[in-house]
């Protein structure tokens, strides 16, 4: 595993940070309408936030939506995410059901990347990473989100390194700043990962208005992906994708 990950025609960890746009619709009609809309925006990959979707727990319904998204997006890579309530999402779900849904999505091959929360435990992470690696096509984005604070730099680095050690292809950490130094803490931790622990690409962000600068300076810090909007935001501080693209190009 290297610091560059290839997903379809997209290379993560190389060049400018890639722009990911989340879809947060609750039904298939709205989901596909939003997918068509984002095709008009600068978008390198798409995240389907399935936790917003009304019936994502029903296997056939979930796979139907994935099939439809896959057709609508063409070669744009698709990231499947169930964000749980513990990490700022909509899903109130048991660890067993969380793992089962992610597992059948991996087996389907319809998503190019699958988000797995580090908080679900080492065994869940390891099993899902193993399933993804056996598929030869699906990549795992290990993630951690703190909506109340920014942990110390060493703790951020430790968590990102743990994600790598458990087999994730990409390591992601999002934090909430309560002061300007908190934003610098997140950026410093990201630079440490880039310079000293570059086994995988990393994705980091400092959320909210205070942390917005972290979403446009990935070329400096080493964050491989930034999340933007073409409609509804899925997290505080996300910027419109066209504005993100302008900043990224001018700051490279």
Model-derived segments and spans:
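Catalytic alpha/beta core domains of metabolic enzymes, predominantly
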Residues: 103, 113, 118-252
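Active-site beta->alpha loop and helix N-cap motifs at the rims of alpha/beta catalytic domains
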Residues: 2-5, 11-132, 139, 144-149
């Amino acid at each position: 595993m290297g610091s560059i990950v290839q997903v379809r025609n997209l290379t993560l960890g190389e060049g400018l940070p890639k722009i990911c746009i989340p879809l947060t619709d609750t039904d298939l009609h709205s989901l596909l309408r939003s997918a068509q809309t984002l095709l008009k925006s600068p978008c390198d990959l798409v995240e389907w936030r399935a936790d917003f979707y009304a019936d994502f727990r029903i296997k056939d319904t979930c796979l139907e939506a994935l099939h439809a998204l896959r057709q609508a997006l063409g070669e744009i890579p698709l990231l499947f995410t169930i964000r749980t309530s513990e990490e700022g999402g909509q899903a109130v779900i048991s660890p067993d059901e969380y793992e089962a849904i992610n597992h059948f999505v991996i087996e389907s091959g319809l998503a190019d990347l699958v988000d797995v929360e580090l908080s679900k435990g080492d065994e869940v992470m390891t099993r899902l990473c193993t399933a993804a690696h056996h598929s030869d096509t699906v990549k795992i984005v290990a993630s951690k989100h703190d909506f109340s604070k920014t942990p110390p730099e060493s703790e951020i680095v430790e968590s990102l390194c743990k994600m790598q050690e458990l087999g994730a292809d990409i390591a992601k950490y999002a934090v909430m700043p309560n002061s300007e130094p908190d934003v610098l803490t997140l950026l410093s931790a990201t630079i440490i990962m880039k310079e000293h622990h570059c086994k995988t690409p990393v994705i980091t962000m400092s959320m909210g208005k205070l942390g917005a600068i972290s979403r446009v300076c990935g070329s400096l810090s080493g964050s491989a992906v930034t999340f933007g909007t073409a409609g509804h935001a899925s997290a505080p501080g996300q910027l419109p994708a066209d504005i993100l693209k302008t900043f990224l190009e001018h700051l490279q």
